[in-house]
């Protein structure tokens, strides 16, 4: 099942436009909405009756908030069928180690080529989890080291 309705949560609005262009190359029905933070997504009445298939959480920060697992759980509670993709500028091996337990379905580096982002979308569409090439290489080479 292709994720048709996608929410991008990122401090940079252009990310949502880029994602829509990438995803529409494989799914012309893909519609991307944007908000600048997780708390807006959780609290806003705008999203009250929205059923997102995929939620992309982006960050330029070196680390995600410590309460990321709780935030992912809240997002999955509000948007029940949503898959969660982290779109990060920096590597955190703990995210990979805890992906299954925390409900994160994909972990992608922000500087991966467009083909890698498209591949992630296709893997999520197939019901699979995915770790992008850069992060997978870092994890297999360095494990829990930074």
Give the label of every model feature segment.
Residues 47-50, 75-81, 102:
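Conserved phosphotransfer cores of two-component systems
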Residues 51-75:
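Conserved phosphotransfer microenvironments
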Residues 81-91:
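A short, hydrophobic beta-strand element within the central beta-sheet of small alpha/beta folds
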Residues 3-14, 19-23, 55:
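Conserved acidic segment of CheY-like receiver
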């Amino acid at each position: 099942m292709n994720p048709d309705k996608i929410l991008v949560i990122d401090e940079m609005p252009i990310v949502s436009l880029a994602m829509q262009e990438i995803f529409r190359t494989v799914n012309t029905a893909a519609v991307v909405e944007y908000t600048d933070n997780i708390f807006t997504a959780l609290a806003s009445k705008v999203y009250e009756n929205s059923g997102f298939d995929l939620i992309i959480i982006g960050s330029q920060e070196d680390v995600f908030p410590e309460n990321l697992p709780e935030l992912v759980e809240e997002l999955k509670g509000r948007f029940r069928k949503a898959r969660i993709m982290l779109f990060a500028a920096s590597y955190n091996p703990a995210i990979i180690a805890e992906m299954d337990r925390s409900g994160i379905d994909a972990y992608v580096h922000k500087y991966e080529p467009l083909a890698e982002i498209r591949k992630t979308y296709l893997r999520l569409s197939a019901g699979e989890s995915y770790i992008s090439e850069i992060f997978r290489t870092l994890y297999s080479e360095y494990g829990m080291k930074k």
